Amino acid sequence: MLKIVKLKMNYQENPIGVTQVPQFGWVLESDKRSVIQASYELQIRADAELKNVLFDSGEMISDESAHVFAEGFQIKSAEKYFVRAKVTDGDGECSGWSETGYFVTALLSEEEWKAEFVSAESKENAGESKGTYVRSSFRVKGNVKAAYAFTTALGLYKFYINGKKVGTDELTPGWTSYLKHLTYQTYDITTMLKEGENGVGAMLGAGWYKGKMGFVGNRNNYGEQTAFLGQIHIAYEDGTTDTIVTDSTWKGSDAPVVFSEIYDGEIYDARLEIEGWAEAGFKAERFWDVETVAFDKKVLEAQSFSKVTEVEPVTAKRIFQTPQGDTVIDFGQNMTGWIHVKVKGKAGDKVELNCFEVLDAKGNVYLDNLRGAKETLTYICKDDQETEYHPNFTFMGFQFAKIASYPGEAKIEDFTAYAVHSDMEQTGTFTCSNQDINQLQHNILWGLKGNFVDVPTDCPQRNERLGWTGDAQIFCRTASYLMNTYHFFAKWLKDVAADQTPEGGVPHVVPDILSGKTDGDWLLEQGSHSAAAWADVAVINPWTMYLTYGDKKILEDQYSSMKAWIGFMEEHAKDYIWNYKLQFG
């Protein structure tokens, strides 16, 4: 029996946030050998009942099951399109229609943005790393056919409708060259709305945008205040529409995240929680007027791909005492992510966990490799009810956690770690009869997971965690055997292009938070960039993506960047010898 088992659009199943007609592809399954596709038919429809056909390819004589295009089809903003396909093999057997998939479009033009970035902070808060709330309410006037939210932030954010978090992604919108390239997210909130008043809000954290970054420790690399951008499109059954936007009517407040930094961890004081802050009917007397923040919306790009998520839980393996008397949790696996903590105490009781990677030779806590990073999770109880907490706007590289403070007896079942990284489908595995080689492969895979948190980093634990271009260039091919990295690298390569110098030079790290930060420093001074092998990422990575996936689009998107880098080398390679300023190794 011939059938389509995976219908994909842009290498994804049911993507949300598409801004161009996607590429289509599928996986065939058959009980026969040597099956070759002879033809396909692709349909796009406007409704789940598949009555309103918008596009029908007819039978196309082709063995292509990837990079299939719906030639001539045009999409509209904030719409859901339903897709199905069928194929016929060389023996004339037809698969029948696949299960119906879908894709949802984002906003297709800058002009459609009516929202403004809003902030509960002012520039006087530039030195602070606390969390804030922004909120509003709106009315739903009838039966909702579909509702989509388009959101992003300067900083990190969590988005809420009627008191419930929207989406499963974390550390959103991730790390980009914010002032030149910022992703926004699309959410289907149709089932979260109710007729009448609805509450909407976001909690914001400093993140990569204004937090302390790099081994130099500079903060406010992109701006001095966090801000949220949100726009909701509602389509009613009667054909009318509504648009809800962030603007100066929104209100702001401090959040219970009293401190949050990428390197140092988070302090969350549950006593400061504001009940119902993102729900309908909330009285915001203690909230203040937000500030609107100017930002160029031309740099916004819809993200339908590789969002950071909690990917897998890792249970604690043991709790033990070190020779120095510290109580330590061992999760049995070095990972990047955070810890879910269950705790029952009284108001003011504190949980404090210091995360770290290894024990020293004597079996004690070892922190030297963290350098200046603290990697500390702190939770302060608000009452005597059992609760569960995990950090909002930070992540750690760890296998162990020292229990510096915990009310009562710490039980192993109270602690569960979660690996957190960009969501990518695993596409390659390797096992053999040699357990040492198997362990090496295991370490490579977990090393990939730990260093693919929105950008390809050098490490996940110390006060660095930067997108070193040389590391990404060297590991790109291996990573692409193990995971579907197409969207992960395509997104990051846009920041490579964005951060190139006007002449075409490539920074040592992308996003570039190092260049020009310290006068006279051999590594950081302005003009220190474009090292051999590191800067070659501008050409090698797009080419590797093309060789791996056969998709010319990434070459089209990156061509100007690739050409600029080659031109830069030609300009500065005297007598064809490349020795431009700083070279590593």
Each PLM stretch: what is its role?
Residues L2-K80, R84-R462, G470-D471, H487-A490, ...:
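Extracellular/oxidizing-compartment recognition motifs
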Residues G167, G201-A202, G467, I540, ...:
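Structural recognition of the beta-strand scaffold that forms the well-ordered cores
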Residues A202, R465, T469-A472, A531-V539:
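Short alpha-helical patches at coil-to-helix transitions and adjacent helical residues
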Residues Y406, I474-T485, A538-I554:
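Well-ordered alpha-helical scaffold segments within catalytic/enzyme domains
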Residues N438-Q441, L445, Y486-A497, V539, ...:
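Hydrophobic core segments within long, regular secondary-structure runs in both alpha-
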Residues K449, T501, L547-G550, G567-K574:
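Sec-exported extracytoplasmic/periplasmic mature domains
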Residues P511-K517, Q526-T544, T548-G550:
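Charged, long alpha-helical assembly modules
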